[in-house]
Amino acid sequence: MSYQTIVNNATTIQINNKPISSATLSRSNRLKTALRGEAIYRFNVAVGRAFEWNATNRAMLQILQQKGRTVEEEITLSQTSGMSYIMGYAGTLDSTQLGDIDIASYTGATLTLDTSNVTGIDPADTLFDVGDYIQPANSRYTYEVTTPVFATDITLNEVDVPVHRNIYPASSDGGNNIVGAGINVANNCTFHVKCLSAPTHTLQPGKLFTFDGNFEFVEVIL
């Protein structure tokens, strides 16, 4: 049973990509806050349905238990019919236009995109809206857009796209240099995760079994 199978059968998915921070309140009632870690993705997945206790599922369950916390897998939130809205694209470009965009450069939490190969962009187009998912095509990491990006923002065939965290360099991305790569958008984006916590399972009448709690998947940063 793969992690993707768990996600595909989810009843609910809780998503947390907030940066880790701390807060202390002094005896003089002065509040101090500090960032303690980067914004990585955490998914808390509940699976409410029952599974048939057959040879196939029993074998997959055993595989799932053996993975523990050490096995990394790639997942998406939109593989199952009816879930595409979770990572849906809110801009107005079509798939061909998005496929013609390349990454020109990056700095901090900003991707600079090359639109020189894109045809048919209208001045009224929204390239990306807040919350859109974007992933360099050769990268492990997915980012979320934090500011609307319009066609009118394009200057000399380049446009800046602010995202929710700093762009990971090649040294933290398996040696992949994202400059010159294309982009994956919305439902084409993926996450590399490990299962930090997995529930036990309970056998039910009728040759069925259910999971007793939620799965917690955490993004793996190299």
Predicted feature locations:
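Extracellular/virion structural assembly segments
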Residues: M1-L222
